[in-house]
């Protein structure tokens, strides 16, 4: 099969993809939209079950994607270099998988042809997170810290 016949992600380097191709790589899992922190003791990056206020927790897509940085100035802009170096990206992330020389997973919407496949495969955060604007968010974050550092809890 020639490059023109193969899917773009199988032959184009991340840097050579068009904006539309780059955006199509997003599987819609919502994991990169979770509030995370780095554990000072271990260096591990821990994702909380609390999502950015702009994430639609049902569709797992940003509700204001084109202008998201106006509302969330520190929203991370993923780049090919970031895909190679940011180890906090989930191992399932298409950008990370391609940067590491792995192909897309069978459940990825570009492979399956079905945008719901990421949810059916249990990869997305659908049904497992709350918005940062939800009153339960602070408690969720506190519970993560409590599990990591049981002796340092404020009761």
UniProtKB/Swiss-Prot annotation:
<dbReference type="Pfam" id="PF03692">
    <property type="entry name" value="CxxCxxCC"/>
</dbReference>
<protein>
    <recommendedName>
        <fullName>UPF0260 protein Mlg_1382</fullName>
    </recommendedName>
</protein>
<dbReference type="InterPro" id="IPR005358">
    <property type="entry name" value="Puta_zinc/iron-chelating_dom"/>
</dbReference>
<dbReference type="InterPro" id="IPR008228">
    <property type="entry name" value="UCP006173"/>
</dbReference>
<comment type="similarity">
    <text>Belongs to the UPF0260 family.</text>
</comment>
